[in-house]
Amino acid sequence: MTAAENVCYTLINVTNDSEPPSEVSLKTDLEKGEIKAKTEALKKVIIMILNGEKLPGLLMTIIRFVLPLQDHTIKKLLLVFWEIVPKTTPDGKLLQEMILVCDAYRKDLQHPNEFIRGSTLRFLCKLKESELLEPLMPAIRACLEHRHSYVRRNAVLAIYTIYRNFEHLIPDAPELIHDFLVNEKDASCKRNAFMMLIHADQDRALDYLSTCIDQVHTFGDILQLVIVELIYKVCHANPSERARFIRCIYNLLQSSSPAVKYEAAGTLVTLSSAPTAIKAAAQCYIDLIIKESDNNVKLIVLDRLIELKEHPTHERVLQDLVMDILRVLTTPDLEVRKKTLQLALDLVSSRNVEELVIVLKKEVIKTNNVTEHEDTDKYRQLLVRTLHSCSVRFPDMAANVIPVLMEFLSDTNEAAAADVLEFVREAIQRFDNLRPLIIEKMLEVFHAIKTVKIYRGALWILGEYCSTKEDIQSVMTEVRRSLGEIPIVENELKKEAGEVKPEEEVTAAPAPKLVTEMGTYVTQSALSTSRPSKKEEDRPPLRGFLMDGDFYVAASLATTLTKVALRYVALAEDKRRQNSFVAEAMLIMATVLHLGKSSLPKKPITDDDVDRISLCLKVLSECSPLMNDIFNKECRRSLSHMLAVRLEEEKLSQKKESEKRNVTVQADDPISFMQLTAKNEMASKEDQFQLSLLAAMGNTQRKEATDPLASKLNKVTQLTGFSDPVYAEAYVHVNQYDIVLDVLVVNQTSDTLQNCTLELATLGDLKLVEKPSPLTLAPHDFANIKANVKVASTENGIIFGNIVYDVSGAASDRNCVVLSDIHIDIMDYIQPASCTDAEFRQMWAEFEWENKVTVNTNITDLNDYLLHILKSTNMKCLTPEKALSGICGFMAANLYARSIFGEDALANVSIEKPIHLGVDAPVNGHIRIRAKSQGMALSLGDKINLSQKRTAS
């Protein structure tokens, strides 16, 4: 009934395993064969007609010998046959034989079997000959009163189609259907009848709706959906009707059908901007997300909530629903949780942040009690980051959050613990009043930390922010506890010597004799020569890291000990205590150096770590004021500067987002008076039903269409030359998951070209959906052929092929014109995206495909080259603008993008300007691209190479 329902296809499976039969054999089967033979013959006739055969001699045979049969399969096949068979003479007059067929239609419309009646009515919807339909009108009208709903609903469809195409055949159709609708009880029949009134006589549809508006909630969901559509269209065209129908939309929010609730909520938002309407719609969306089990539905509805939030006035209403939105976190799907947390974070305000933090704390504790799973770890990370953001925006909440989160520093999941550590580092720097609490909790969990990266970070925080003698002593105590007895080498050797003795006293069990390859006997000891693992488990954490050969943590330990020792010297007045503390710190460093150079660790200490520890020993032995300032002031100043820059960037990005959302009102814009406000509001909105229909049909307007200077002609690809007998050019229309080729084919000859076929093939991750149908081109005629290509991933695809045709009257072989290749631009599938530095590094380490592109350009400015690459690749620069600003001879930047298929693409730009070659020297260097798939890495590299060459020329 809508634009999408105007076309109805019947799909027929064609087998190519046999030769096409002759007309004589088909005629014999149709005349004298059994039911089965007639069925097969009729199928073959249908396929041959679809392939372009005329078969005029079989029409009367089928009317005489097949049409009278009552077999249901044959009746179904006959409906297909009558649909495709030519019904007119070359001059457009109806064939005489069709009068007999018309009588058969009439009998089928009066058949006692409801299926035959209903399917015949459906078939009549496809007829385009009014002469055939006119004698059938009384029988079609009578079907409206049939006892079976299948017949009645198809009768409504038939009447609507006939009224739309040939109004003179049934001029009273709207009145007839209105009367039918008033008395009808079946939901599907009422839906079809109401749908017809919407399109044929909207006033009658509104009159009917007005009479039963209070009973709408009792209707079936299919009728409710149509009512929602009608109300939307009426109010969109005539805003003054909103007050009349908005209560009905409110009632439909309580429908038992999720589809009706979803459509009603969307309609309510477009019809009214009142806070009560927005709140009701948002509440409906939230209930749908919670109750629906399909994660795709949850994500779609979440997107609608996010769209609501983009409107400044709606955002204030949604802020009161943050706690309801958090109920969605009961969904186990990570993507749903991620979107929910982001939405809640965007909406949180000082009024509800406390409640939000309480809920998130409970969720964090829950993740600790759940069986470990990959998604559980990622969810915990999301929660930690959300709490981190809340604490930065609302400092009063930090004191409640920190104790809970710091328990996770001892977590085995390094990623979650690293997020907690980053949060703690920022909190201890920003909030002076929380430092004692953070130090206390850090000292509590310090011994339980299991991963070396987290241990290093915790050491740094303790060394940087312990400012009292008691805290400094506590740090030293924890370090000694974590290191075990010192000197480490002597202690380990003693343990080794002590463990050998009891093993010698153990009575060896009788060992079985084994035969070697050489035929000699060998005995197997019952004692294991490898070190028992329990001893390794019993080692204190820091000693365990050192014995594993990780001496980077030793360098971090040396820096921490230097900081606390210098601070202790400044705080303690007793010279003996000062010397004692410094000596203890130096002893620990010396014993670590000794261990690193011994053969006990799995890996020896590196030269860099030796230099760092030696430097710290020298600083402590000399205690100069300059070194004191560097260790105790400059380090903290660097952190403070980094956090300030990051905060400034976040504020800048938030400002840009808010500017995007705010509707700018120009000084010369017309003023909307009260009487005109509603109309003005509605006029600015597009028809949502039309937009969704276009999206479903793949006709959405892409972003380039928003530019008035942009033209489809920019994407036209010439496929053949002007001197070829057939000229062809294609417009490449890229949708989300498919490509539509709109090919213009022009016959440049004076001959008629028969069976002109566009033959296409693909290279890459592309797949041709269906082969274009052959056509006939008159001399100098033209036609448009459309072909659909399915896209499965972001790779550079190539479409190639040719046009083949026969010349009318010529006896030669088929002619062929080879087409130029069509290269599919992957930029249509790549979108800029953001990720944190930690996520970027993690993906960089995980992705196995790398493509290194050498810079080859004539651009002489580093920033200009970077901007050119960003524009060419559609990627986003993750490196802050401040880090890239200034005049420098080199530049390094990280770029990131995601495809619509969820594929990640990373790039690292490392470029320099060779000073010795002069001011006009071009930029050189390289770009490293990493991706999970080889195709993505290669495609992006090709794109960069092509754009460089274009610039260079």
From Swiss-Prot:
Coiled coil: none annotated. It is found in: Cytoplasm; Golgi apparatus membrane; Cytoplasmic vesicle, COPI-coated vesicle membrane. InterPro entries: ARM-like, ARM-type_fold, Clathrin/coatomer_adapt-like_N, Coatomer_bsu_C, COPB1, COPB1_appendage_platform_dom. Gene3D superfamilies: Leucine-rich Repeat Variant. It is a peripheral membrane protein. Disruption phenotype: From 28 hours post-fertilization (hpf) onward, embryos show an anterior-posterior gradient of pigmentation defects. While the head is fully pigmented, more posterior regions are decreasingly pigmented until midtrunk levels, where pigmentation is not detectable. Melanophores are present at midtrunk levels and migrate correctly, but are not properly pigmented. Embryos show severe reduction in pigmentation and widespread degeneration from 48 hpf onward. Failure to form perinotochordal basement membrane (PBM), without the loss of laminin immunoreactivity. One of its GO terms (biological process) is somite development. One of its GO terms (cellular component) is Golgi membrane. GO terms for molecular function: structural molecule activity. It comes from the Eukaryota. Keywords: Cytoplasm, Cytoplasmic vesicle, ER-Golgi transport, Golgi apparatus, Membrane, Protein transport, Repeat, Transport. HEAT repeats lie at residues 96-131, 132-168, 240-276, 277-314, 316-353, 396-433. Pfam families: Adaptin_N, Coatamer_beta_C, Coatomer_b_Cpla. The coatomer is a cytosolic protein complex that binds to dilysine motifs and reversibly associates with Golgi non-clathrin-coated vesicles, which further mediate biosynthetic protein transport from the ER, via the Golgi up to the trans Golgi network. Coatomer complex is required for budding from Golgi membranes, and is essential for the retrograde Golgi-to-ER transport of dilysine-tagged proteins. Oligomeric complex that consists of at least the alpha, beta, beta', gamma, delta, epsilon and zeta subunits. This is Coatomer subunit beta. It comes from Danio rerio.
